[in-house]
């Protein structure tokens, strides 16, 4: 069993924030927070924007964030 690193723990906490809130402002802020983790956060953001309960605006913001991370991680 591996010990989770700090990034994984933080990503889990931010994802929990999104799942426990239906507020688009909170969800968008959480995606922005995830973006600070760079590449490791892409899967988390993809999972979040794949939820049926997420608004179209948040999904669009998530897709833009993933694009930004990919373009700036090289």
What are these regions (language model features)?
Residues 1-5, 16, 25-39, 57-74:
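Structural detector for internal amphipathic alpha-helices that build alpha-solenoid repeat scaffolds
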Residues 7-11, 42:
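Core helices of alpha-solenoid repeat scaffolds
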Residues 22-23, 53-55:
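Short inter-helical turns and helix N-cap capping residues of alpha-solenoid HEAT/ARM repeat scaffolds
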Residues 13-15, 45-48:
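Buried hydrophobic core positions in alpha-solenoid tandem helical repeats
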